[in-house]
Every structure is written in structure tokens, then in C-alpha cells.
Amino acid sequence: MSTARLQQQFIRLWQRFSGLPTETTLQELAEVLCCSRRHVRSLLGSMQQEGWLSWQAEAGRGKRSQLTFLYSGLALQQQRAEELLEQEGIDQLVQLVGDKKAVRQMLLSQLGRSFRQGKHILRVLYYRPLQNLLPGTALRRSETHMVRQIFNGLTRINEENGELEPDLSHHWQAISPLHWRFYLRPAIHFHHGRELEMNDVITSLTRLIPQPLFSHITAVRSPTPYVIDVHLSAPDNWLPWLLGSVHAMILPQEWENQPDFRRHPIGTGPYSVIRNHQSQLKIQAFDNYFGFRALIDEVNIWVLPELSEELVYSGVQLQADDTSKNELESRLEEGCYFLLFDQRSPLTRNPDIRRWLCELITPVALLSHADPFYQRYWSPAYGMLPRWHHNRLRVLETKPEGLTELTLTFYSHHSEFDAISQTLTKLLADQGVNLKIHVVDYTQWYQGDAQSDMWLGSANFYLPLEFSLFATLYELPLLQYCLDEELHQDVELWRNNTLQMADWSQRLVSQNQFHPLFHHWLELYGQHSMRGVRMNTLGWFDFKSAWFTPPET
């Protein structure tokens, strides 16, 4: 029997008798431990060897033996809990302790920096699992950040200034408006040991051609070793940025044959995935990374869905509750929470209904009906970006006739959506409109794969905003169902750098097709001993650039 199992059995005995000396029989103990009398005798012998208890057996049927506890079950439980924390056994820890609030406090006490067996380890607490890390699929904000730590593209977009930097390719050039050439570094290795081949790049990029942003790619070839040619059907000045976006990360060509690649992907990036399940994502520094090796050896993201709302909303948590003064950085997101109105719906296809809804559902009205707690994290949005004021306050007109019920759809594991939908329900009920709530998974939401009148969502844009704002929305299939116009002409202007993003955004907002609600405050909490931490527009930071100062002696 494993030590862990023996510990659990002892704790069960200690709890049954409250740690007090007692006279009992093997049969009674067998019933407590749900095993045979013979096995109980073996267990008691093992527990005596550990020094946890004393068992003085009395011979004869009906005789009661003396059980004396020499060690506290609480102390053993705490010892076991610490062992599970060291092993990142969060699921077993919840089973052992039985109290999720107590587990939460244990986890919080272990957040931040740890130094074990010569390795620097960073522990982060998060409120939901990160189960899809496959580039080119529907990725939420935190998954997007993790993919950037695991994979590389031909180019890299600097998170701080939006400038384009070398990555897998060290140089690139436009041979012609329809022909780009990228020169790749040699001796790049994937996490599973194989060297990067040109066919990996070719298969990674050609798999994206069905997606709107990449549909103008006609061919990807390698004329000579370490050279990649990308041929286009239309000019694209943003192509080098596009090939540095998270969708265009390079995968091993055999990725579809790898077991559970979405959860356990294989890239060439500074971190490789060691473990990814419901309660933990663990990544470790890749020693054969072609760039500067990461300074933090391991990043452990502990998942505890039962986190308090405060912890969910406050952002990335790298410290315990009692060190709230250690806010490293905060910023208003480049993006917003928004409503989209589905053109497939007879109701929201009606411009009068859309206009009335936008008049009713204002950011100020939502905040006034919401719990005061949210005012700390929500800032009224009048455009897609905080600096834009495209949504003018208007007088609420008479409700259109026949409007009695609407359906709102949003994706799961986003508690702020629950709060917003409750507020929307109140606002609409006051006007005699019943709001039906439909919760789907993120992929369904992303694809617009449901019948709905309105869709609640959020978008985080990154630098350069002239690139990411249009790219993020254009690659969202749901948006195509919520516009009364095609974007083909707009994408041509955007690729030629002639689309004015402020004007384009204002058009969507003023036509009541895209309705901004809030900008969210992103906050990063951690220890001041952390260095190299710069919060990006996704609310995270580049793990490979962070490091710890040595503790003071």
C-alpha cells in the first residue's frame, strides 16, 4: 500500500474517534475502513511502524482492544496537503481536505515564486482550464497568450510596441507585391526533438488557406533549403504581421497524428507543455530553444473554478490575498465587451429594433443596474477602443411593436457575462421584453453556431492596433452573420493600408451592428521581486523575459 493511501486510512480512523483513546475491535475498525479484519490488522501494524498510533490487542472473542493515537490526523493531513502541493496534485488535494475554501487558501499561500531543486518556479492561480492550445482554431484571450509561449511564427509581433521582429525567419522581403520570401534559421528543434523542416512550414501555412485572413495565399513553396516563398492572389502589406499572428504559428507536419494535440501541443517555443488537465497547466523551459533560454524554469497554472469573483475579475494572480499592495501593473484593455445583432434573426435584422436596443442598453444604464462591485473593473465604452467615442447617447424612443422576447447567447466559463446578462434581463423586463439566455461553448460562439437575436462577447486587440483590430474581427465567423454588408472591399483596403480603422469602426457602431458596452481594467498582481514583467494587452506577460531577484539575506 502506498504511503498516501495509508495516510488517508489513518486520517479516517482519527476522524472517526476524534483522536481520543478508545476500546474497539477489529470488526468495528474493518467497518470504518471498509475492508476485511485481516487487512485491518496489517494496516494497524503499518501505522504503528510509522509511529502514528498504538494498538494493544486483546486475545479472545468479544475482547476489546486498546487504540491510542500518538499523532494528530490534522497534522498528517496538513503534511499530506503540502506534499500534494509540491506535486501539483490539486484534484487529490481537494479530495483530501474536502473543503474547497481551505484548498483555495492553501493554493494562495503557495503562489508566486518557488525555488526547488535548483529551479525557479512560478505558480499562477486561474479560474478555468486551458484545454485548447491549437493555433488556427477558436482561442480565447489566455489561450492566445499560452500559444505564444509554446509556438513560433515566421515573424514575431513585439507585444510592447507592435513592431515586427525576426522569429523562425531572420530576414524577409517582398520579391513582388504577390510574392514574399522568408529566410529561416537553421537547426531549430521541436519540443519532441525533431529538427524543423521546410515542409512543417508549408503544411502549417497551407492548412490556414480556408480561413478568410489567409484565403489570398495561393501557394507556399521552398525553392531552396531554409527559404520559404509565399505567393498571393492579391497584394497584402500586412502579410509579415499576419505570419507572426497566433493563427500562423508553425506546427510539426505530423501534428494530427500526435495524441490529444490540442491539450498537449508540440511547438518550437521557449516553453513546452508537460501537463495539461482540468486542474493544472504546467509548462517548462525548453533547453533547446533557438533564442534566449527562459529565465523561469517552470510555470504552473493551477485551476480552481470555485475562485471568488474578486479573484476572477482582478486578473492574473501571482500572490496571496494578503499582499494586495503588490499590484505590478494595471491598464484599460485595448478592446471591449460588446453586443452583436444577428442578421439571420427577423427581429434584429430590423434596423428599428436594433436602434431601440442600442438606445436602451447603454453602458451607464448597465452600470446603474449592476452590483457596485463591477464599477471597479468596468469602464463605459463608446467605441471599440477607449480613445474612440463613436456611440452617442440618444433619447429612448417608443419600443417597436411586437417586441416581447429576445434571445441572448454567450459562451461559458465567463462569470462577467452572467452578471451582464442579469442586468440586461432587468433592463429589458422593465420594457416588457423577456430575455432568454443561451450559453454555449466558445467554439460554438466563435462560429455563430446557434439561433440567437443577440450575441454577447469580448475582444482584446494588440499592437499594432491598425493590424489587429480588423484582423481579429474579420477572422471571427460570427461577425459575418451580424453585418448587413460584405467585408470583401474592406479587406482589400486594409491589406493596402488604406482602410481608416476609426472610420470603419464608427460605421459598424453607428449602424447599430456592433454595440460596445465596457472596457475592462486588466490588473496584474505579483511579488515586487519579479523583474522583466510587462503586462501585455491580453493581461498576461511574457514568461521567458521574467525573472526573480534573489531573496535578501
From Swiss-Prot:
Keyword Nucleotide-binding on entry: no
Keyword set includes Repeat: no
Annotated InterPro entries: SBP_5 (IPR039424), SBP_5_dom (IPR000914), SgrR_HTH_N (IPR025370), Tscrpt_reg_SgrR (IPR023767), WH_DNA-bd_sf (IPR036390)
UniProt xrefs under SUPFAM superfamilies: Periplasmic binding protein-like II, Winged helix' DNA-binding domain
Keywords, alphabetical: Activator, DNA-binding, Repressor, Transcription, Transcription regulation
Residue intervals passing through the bilayer: none
Known DNA-binding region: 26-49
Biological process annotations from GO: negative regulation of DNA-templated transcription; peptide transport; positive regulation of DNA-templated transcription
Protein name per UniProt: HTH-type transcriptional regulator SgrR
